[in-house]
Amino acid sequence: MPELPEVETTRRGIDPVITGQTLRRLVVREPRMRWPIPADLPSLLTDRPVLATGRRGKYLLLRFEHGVQIVHLGMSGSLRRVAMDEAPRKHDHVDWVFDHAILRLHDPRRFGAVLWHPNTDGPVEAHPLLIGLGIEPFDPRFDGKWLHDHFRDKRVAVKQALLAGHAVVGVGNIYASECLFRAGIDPRTPAGKLSRPRCERLAQAVRATLADALASGGSTLRDYVGASGEPGAYFAIHAAVYERAGLACRVCGTPIRRLVQGQRATYFCPHCQKR
């Protein structure tokens, strides 16, 4: 699934292309996404300028004068710029057509979303998909104290607590394993048992890992590409544990282990990461 670095990389790629430009047409070839695309959405947005782009967690935000379009890339989706004369391929479900550019949503599994939040419903942060999200990892308020306060009394494993997104957003399955390795924390450790210093190390690891991923254009394991069609390079360059089961830890040489938590694969070093 595209995680925060992939979504932010996409936003940075499309922002100079569409901000200030008028959307001439929204072409919906397949409305049956995770939630149905509203039938009136093309008429609501035709000939309307994009005022700004944004992101909340893993959601892309396209701001118009009368509301905000919420776009989620699902499990395997991508949003990229294509040539004006490029024919759609299989699984190319939505086009944003501007005078000199087309953005195309490709989503083989149709787990993504293209939704609309009118200004009359209040700020977009109050949308049901966004209102329960935790703090952004690069918010100055996010630190060890923040994590320690939000993890207090939680019996769930720290890996699961990160994935839930209530304490901090954007740490998906790939980066959760990487962050915990960087912090030296066993992913099975109950979140509520982490000391304040260990929470501080984890907060620092989250920021550093996501910053590295952003600098590398995100991660590409199977489907993700950026706005220009380029794959992310983080996984090939930086991955310490993810999908390295049985291989030697890059730090101590101990074989990396794999386990399943909440039906998701977790990777860790049993020597470097302590409970």
Swiss-Prot record:
The record's listing under CDD domains reads: EcFpg-like_N
List, alphabetically, the InterPro entries matched.
Answer: DNA_glyclase/AP_lyase_DNA-bd (IPR015886), DNA_glyclase_Znf_dom_DNA_BS (IPR015887), Formamido-pyr_DNA_Glyclase (IPR020629), FPG_cat (IPR012319), MutM-like_N-ter (IPR035937), Ribosomal_uS13-like_H2TH (IPR010979), Znf_DNA_glyclase/AP_lyase (IPR000214), Znf_FPG/IleRS (IPR010663)
One example of the protein's molecular function in GO is: zinc ion binding
Where on this chain does DNA bind? H91, R109, K154
Cofactor(s) of this protein? Zn(2+)
Q: Which family does it belong to?
A: Belongs to the FPG family.
UniProt protein name: Formamidopyrimidine-DNA glycosylase
Q: Which organism is it from?
A: Bordetella avium (strain 197N)
